[in-house]
């Protein structure tokens, strides 16, 4: 077996997947190279071609298959891996006693929203122990913005007897810096929640491989 392939695998077993570079992770996924190109070289070529791991994971079938060394089989495997990750995060949130750890909500929102090509506004509804009741993509917009109606969020929260909410939306541009309208919306949502006794936990803006948390900003 190709030693170049084994090196990332051995590194993963010794130090965990988080110790691997994007190139090494992709090499494990690809398993083998192509004629005249070892798998580590191929994985770097693929990353260079797409610009980032995120762009690779977000590519449609036609774009994906235009890259040398990639085909329909790899595309199917990648989509299945992405979906398993989403479901794992959702199930983690369902079985945990609460969502007191901010990173868990962030990871779930990133998995759901990072690859969206238009703005999507999503809400997590929690009970009084911060356990997830449900999560829902409530508003869809254009590449620049999504129109959000606080009253609809409150109506849904009351309908499912939520004691708290966490909201998030993505910036398709990749820049997670909140706009003035994002800040204004956050204030409106906080006020609307306060009026009906629902706790507003956080508003998270999802970018490319990064995020902004209004709650975390208070402690900076």
Swiss-Prot record:
The secretion signal range is none
Q: Which domain of life is it from?
A: Bacteria
Q: What are the record keywords, sorted?
A: Hydrolase, Metal-binding, Metalloprotease, Protease, Zinc
Q: Which GO terms describe its biological process?
A: proteolysis
Q: Which CDD domains match?
A: MPN_DUF2466
Domain MPN: start-end pairs? 98-220
Locate the motif JAMM motif.
169-182
The protein's GO terms of the molecular function aspect are: metal ion binding; metallopeptidase activity
Locate the residues binding Zn(2+). 169, 171, 182
| Gene3D superfamilies on file | Cytidine Deaminase, domain 2
Report the family membership: Belongs to the UPF0758 family.
Q: What is this protein called?
A: UPF0758 protein APL_1970
Its source organism is Actinobacillus pleuropneumoniae serotype 5b (strain L20)
